A protein has these predicted regions:
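An N-terminal hydrophobic leader/cap segment in hydrolases
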Residues: 10-67
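Short beta-strand element of the alpha/beta-hydrolase
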Residues: 86-94
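The serine-hydrolase catalytic nucleophile loop
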Residues: 95-108, 268
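Alpha/beta-hydrolase active-site loop
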Residues: 134-161
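Hydrolase active-site cap/lid region
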Residues: 181-235, 267
Length: 323
């Protein structure tokens, strides 16, 4: 019996360092996946207001703005001012994109409605981002609240409030997560357009991991999910269900868009349509090809048709709220 115990202890002492090293390796690899994914590749803006303004008088009026977030960091965005006390619309881009992806839509929306338009860079996105890490919708939701506060602080030339009471939000994929959460928190968000929305932050993270690390995707996604606990020790990462957020959006206008170019998010968007309360005015268009997820690869005709759908939604829902 004593010999057996000694053998077990010897085996345990030999095995314990291996277990510890293996655990540390798993933690290190999982954090490495998150580190890479939370810092998407950077690229130059597709177009800037300076270049856009050469062809559009309205585009030449876009200004570059910064404002404080609630956690002490800063956000930035392009702002196109509208008429005094008119609604404002915030356009949120998808993961891996930046504010230049929504500039054309923003200018056309302003031309059609004279609403104030804000086009922010989400965390870790755009040239030389002000915040280095994306949190896949967690702290970005707090940033969206700060963006609304920034809009409410704007003054017109007459030193009156530039933006009226009502706000609209539009988002694609990551941007859709942010837009929905912002609407759930703020009843002044009256019009919500969501394109290719993931079911939650894990759904977005897994999709991104699968694209960046396609080998053994099921294993890498599990490791990445595990790594979020350590990497986002500040609580920025939240895996809240979009269905639960949708249940809080009462008596609002919602437009859901999706397409076969992002089939996973097409499915999650269709499922989301069943989560809103009965008094939500809901429109759906989930058979697009392409959706806003890959609209930059579309023809001019497809891009124009998509933009006009979004513009018509905000024009109808927010202009009626002004009356």
């Amino acid at each position: 019996m004593a010999i057996t115990k000694r053998l077990f202890k010897s085996f345990y002492r030999l095995l314990l360092p291996v277990i510890i090293l293996l655990a540390l390796a798993i933690v290190g690899v999982s954090i490495g996946f998150i580190y890479k994914t939370a810092r998407p590749p950077k690229a130059k803006y597709l177009v800037t207001p300076e270049k856009y303004g050469r062809f559009s008088a309205r585009g030449a009026r876009v200004t570059d703005e910064t404002w404080a977030n609630r956690d002490g960091t800063s956000s930035r965005g392009w702002l196109l001012r509208g008429a005094e006390k008119s609604p404002a619309v915030i356009l949120f881009h998808r993961y891996g994109a930046d504010r230049s992806y929504v500039l054309n839509l923003g200018v056309k929306l302003n031309e059609a409605t004279n609403f104030t338009i804000l086009m922010p860079d989400l965390r870790a996105h755009g040239e030389n981002p002000l915040v280095k890490n994306s949190s896949f919708g967690g702290c970005e939701t707090d940033d969206a609240a700060a963006a609304i506060e920034f809009l409410k602080s704007l003054k017109s030339e007459n030193q009156k409030n530039l933006v009226g009471q009502d706000i609209g939000v539009y988002g694609v994929e990551l941007g859709a997560l942010v837009a929905l959460s912002a609407a759930a928190r703020n009843e002044n968000v009256k019009a919500v357009a969501l394109d290719s929305i993931p079911a939650n932050s894990n759904n977005l993270l897994n999709s991104t991991i699968n694209k960046n690390f396609p080998f053994a995707s099921s294993l890498t996604t599990k490791l990445a999910e595990f790594g979020t606990r350590a990497y986002f020790y500040d609580g920025c990462y939240k895996n809240d269900s979009v269905c639960e957020a949708a249940k809080q959006i009462t008596n609002r206008n919602v437009f859901l868009l999706a397409g076969s170019d992002a089939p996973d998010f097409q499915t999650s968007t269709e499922k989301l349509s069943r989560c809103f309360p009965p008094n939500t005015h809901l429109e759906t268009k989930t058979d697009l090809n392409p959706s806003g997820y890959s609209i930059t690869n579309a023809s001019l005709e497809q891009s124009e048709a998509y933009d006009q759908r979004v513009i018509a939604f905000f024009k109808q829902t927010l202009e009626s709220s002004e009356r």
